[in-house]
Amino acid sequence: MGTEFNGLFDEWAHTYDSFVQGEDIQYKEVFAHYEDILEDVVNKSFGNVLEFGVGTGNLTNKLLLAGRTVYGIEPSREMRMIAKEKLPKEFSITEGDFLSFEVPTSIDTIVSTYAFHHLTDDEKNVAIAKYSQLLNKGGKIVFADTIFADQDAYDKTVEAAKQRGFHQLANDLQTEYYTRIPVMQTIFENNGFHVTFTRLNHFVWVMEATKQ
């Protein structure tokens, strides 16, 4: 993942919070139970947390309130500006992405929500391999994102979006890199993790991977 999505992120920054509140009918199901999803990620995290894709700071705020020490990474300048308005003044957000970032001294948990699909499956593998080197035994990766149980589930979801006239959603599903559970399970296991997948709405699953 380079900077190819930065323009999209900057454009989306000022409307993102309305999306997650379900104001766009096409994405309402994608963000169903949004607060519960964030809380689940927080509850599965511990210690020093590295967060990729801070966005407008919604997950970050919950992590801080839960007493986590958070290192935030966000590629979009506009997103960083909005997040800084919502978060404590002393909290800093570093420019970077899943593959290119400043490594904090000690990390226990790596988290992200609604962002890992910006990487191809090959890039996902590179990223997880990198994180495996950063985490000690017992360290965790907790990612919430749109993924699919298998190809059939993906195909049916795309077709349903088209049938409902949700053409923007269908295009999104077909142009970004939404992966399948077997792919992610293989990636995690090949890099020394035990992983579980928990579905929290039709689109979003929480991946909880523990370093062995």
Curated annotation (Swiss-Prot):
Binding sites annotated in the UniProt record for S-adenosyl-L-methionine: G53, E74, D97
GO-annotated biological processes: methylation
Protein EC: 2.1.1.-
Listed InterPro entries: Methyltransf_25 (IPR041698), SAM-dependent_MTases_sf (IPR029063), Uncharacterised_MeTfrase_YrrT (IPR023553)
Alphabetized UniProt keyword annotations: Methyltransferase, S-adenosyl-L-methionine, Transferase
Record-linked CDD domains: AdoMet_MTases (cd02440)
SUPFAM superfamilies: S-adenosyl-L-methionine-dependent methyltransferases (SSF53335)
Reported function: Could be a S-adenosyl-L-methionine-dependent methyltransferase.
Protein name: Uncharacterized methyltransferase BT9727_4108
Family in the record: Belongs to the methyltransferase superfamily. YrrT family.
GO MF, one annotated term: S-adenosylmethionine-dependent methyltransferase activity
